């Protein structure tokens, strides 16, 4: 059985050059890292194999050099999505995978053109599929906002979330995800569209989509936002939950793109 070939809609979504895709990696001590990885594409010459360009992925590459386990989220503009796990295999400096990455519109016309190499991932499992109705997005965003107003998830610990980051996470029309390391040791990435500022040092969300996994209380988590303007930030911290409400006490914040891709800003 082929995970990619036997899952309706997944290959077409992966082939979309602008389809939002996220790659989660882990450090040796189990800290998750999750970033947009739009360059993820299916390898047309091998089953259940993905390639990606080494482009603005500094922390991810460092993690892959120490632990090959990855989590992947693919989500379409219609909010249909797939949650995968996989194993990083290798980097290739030359060959068809590199050529295909370099010929993509994302890299061909980018001011920061060029990839160092192409990474190869073997898909291991399909963890979940989902489809999020638009009305559910509105409902969950409102419920998360209500939780924040009521003070849920606020605390004295953590670092203040900078205003530019708060402004982006306050947007409803953006792709937001949540990642953590599962008991199997593999990172898991799920949609968290309702993620938004809570207190000065927290982010809150509402888990209204049935069937999706969620991190246990106290877990080390990472969340990332990708806006329509290709702005991205990543926040890391500690997870707490009460019913369907969840919160992150933020410990670290990173920029996702130029001029400081992967650089810590808080």
What is each of the regions a protein language model found here?
Residues 1-266:
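Binding-site signature for planar aromatic cofactors or substrates
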